[in-house]
Each structure stands twice: as C-alpha cells, then as structure tokens.
Amino acid sequence: WSVMGRPVFVLACATCELMLSRLVPEIQTVSLYRLLGQVENLTNRASFPAAAIFDPCAARDNDGFREDVRKLAQRFGYTPQELPEQGHCCGWGGHMRTANPALYQSLAERQAGKSDLPYLVYCANCREVFLEQGKECRHILEILLGTCDRVYYLHEKHENRLRVKEAFMKELQNQPFTPPVHLWDGITLLIDRQVQQEMEANLIDNDTVKECIWCAREQGSGFVDQNGVNLACLKRSVMTYWVEYTETPEGYRIQSAYCHRMRFEEVQA
C-alpha cells in the first residue's frame, strides 16, 4: 500500500471497512456505493417492485455506509422498507453454522421472516444465507450488473476470485497472473450434491479434500475398511479434517468429509 502511494481503498464490504478502520486507520477508504451513486445513467438490470433493506451487522454503527446504500437504491427507483431491527447478524457470523447448526437455522429463519418483501442486501454472506432460506434476495450490485439467484460453492467462489485477479492484473497493470500451483491439483473428485452441501455447511472446500487425499496417498497413511472405503486425515493449525472416499477409474468418489477443532499427535513408543 505504501509503495503504491497510499491509495484510497474502494470498499463494497462493510466488514472490510470495519476491520481496516480498527486495525489500519491510516488507510483512507470510500464505499463503492457512494461512488456509484455519483455515476450518471445507471442501468437497472434486476429490480424488485418493492424491497426491504437488510443491513449487515458490520454496518450497524456505520451511518455513512448505510446512507450510501440507501441513496444508491433510490437511484434505482427504490424507497426500501426499513426493518424494525437493523444491523443484526444474519446467522453467518462466528462460524455459527458449523459450531451450532440448529442455532444458525433458527436465527436465519427469524431474520428472513422480518418482512414479507424481498431483501435488498449489500453483504455477500447475507445474500447467501437468505437465498438458502428460500428468501427472495439480491445484492444491490446485482441490480446494476444482473442477477444469478443461486449460491456458489466454495471452490467456485475461489476460482472466480482468481479469474477476477487475473483480469485486473492484465487490465490495470498489464501483467500476467499465474495462480498458485499445488501438487494435488490434478486429483479429480466425484462429489454428490448432498455430500457437497454437507461440506459447504462445514466450510470444507474441494482443495482441502484433494490435499487430504494426496497426503494420505503420498505418505501411505490413512485406513481402508473391508469395503474398500478409505479414511484419511489432514491436520491444519487447530483443525483436523477427515475424508472418506473410494477410488474409481474416473477419480476419487467422496463419501463424506468432516472436521473438528482438535489435533492429535502420534507418539513413538
């Protein structure tokens, strides 16, 4: 940042703004929504007839951020309904879904039910939580850029971020970008929808599963039961990941993947 001349950060995420203001207050920031509100002839590509605005918890004490979003919504023809309570957690925060799924579900349902109107949000996590609850919901940027009413998997979001970085590096700096290469990248996973959704709920991405299988294969670790189902583990910091899988000619079929906040060490006798 200093080498680049201490530029202003343009932020679309209230959490990013909150963390930067706390930890690196010397960085000047401006919300993307304020800048967009100054652009002429904005295109409305995916509007609702009416909507309620849901403020993320990180914007609870950020009057400027909330106001920028409301002014931009008005540019799109909205006078969004205000919810009776603002700035409450949608359920995503604190890894609640992994630590206490029942509490997460209860909170997400309660927040989704605060209004019968569709929600207009400006937090990617809020968007995902409400779409998974079947609540009509759009990020305010979708009104400008077009919408896709689905929740993407972790590995899809990671791949998209790499594509965005590659495009920006080429367009803004005329430099190539080569994503990091891992020894397990060539592993092919076969994952049923239900298993993939269970992995998502536990914040386990495909790369972690690939690494776990690769380490077990290279180190000769893991277990195999009488039915040919393999069990392998991967230790990272305070987390231990477990993967059950079978080998097929087409790739590794994942039976299940789970994790816990526990490490274990092998002790030589």
Where are these regions (language model features)?
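Iron-sulfur cluster-binding electron-transfer modules in prokaryotic oxidoreductases
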Residues: 1-183
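Ribonuclease/tRNase effector modules and their secretory precursors
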Residues: 150-269
